[in-house]
Design a protein with these regions (language model features):
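Conserved short strand/loop->alpha-helix "switch" segment adjacent to the catalytic nucleotide/phosphoryl-transfer site
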Residues: 6-27
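Conserved transmitter core of two-component histidine kinases
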Residues: 2-9, 45, 95-98
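Short helix-loop "hinge" at the ATP-lid/N-box region of the Bergerat-fold HATPase_c
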Residues: 33-37
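Short beta-strand/loop element within the Bergerat-fold HATPase_c
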Residues: 41-51, 58
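C-terminal end segment of the histidine kinase catalytic
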Residues: 114-124
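Short, highly conserved beta-strand within the GHKL-type HATPase_c fold
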Residues: 52-56, 63, 108
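ATP phosphate-binding glycine-rich loop and adjacent ATP-lid/helix-beta elements
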Residues: 69-102
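Glycine-rich GHKL/ HATPase_c ATP-binding element in histidine kinases
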Residues: 103-107
Length: 124
């Protein structure tokens, strides 16, 4: 069992199709925490400031996993994190993976929500 804390403002609004992406990314990131981190806690922080959407997911698990274990290496059958990174980069965003002091991992994603541009082809 993993205890999950979720933090966002009461009036948070995420436009389509970004809401679907965020849902899928959170689902994949929490699945990774459950399967690979050996942690007992996960924290999700979601915010939007002037069209900049920020998603942070961290855990208190094992901080010394390799990139292959994390699904970021080339020689791995696990593609979850590398898939998220690719999607974020296609949207012109940033994806950062780091240690979560004192233990665990932290993933930070930032993307700009463009109201006029449609990325629906990207979600399908």
């Amino acid at each position: 069992t993993i205890k999950i804390s979720f933090e966002c403002s009461d009036d948070l609004f995420i436009a389509e199709p970004y809401n679907i992406l965020i849902y899928r990314w959170i689902k994949e990131l929490l699945t990774n925490v459950y399967k690979h981190s050996n942690g007992k806690r996960a924290w999700i922080i979601l915010s939007v400031e002037r069209k900049l959407l920020k998603l942070t997911v961290c855990d208190n698990g094992t901080p010394t996993m390799s990139t292959n274990t994390l699904g970021m290496g080339k020689n791995t059958k696990h593609k979850g994190l590398s898939s998220i990174r690719e999607q974020v980069e296609k949207l012109g965003g940033s994806f950062a993976l780091s240690n979560n002091f004192p233990q665990g991992f932290r993933i930070e994603i930032e993307i700009v929500m463009n109201g006029g541009n449609s990325y629906q082809y990207f979600i399908s």
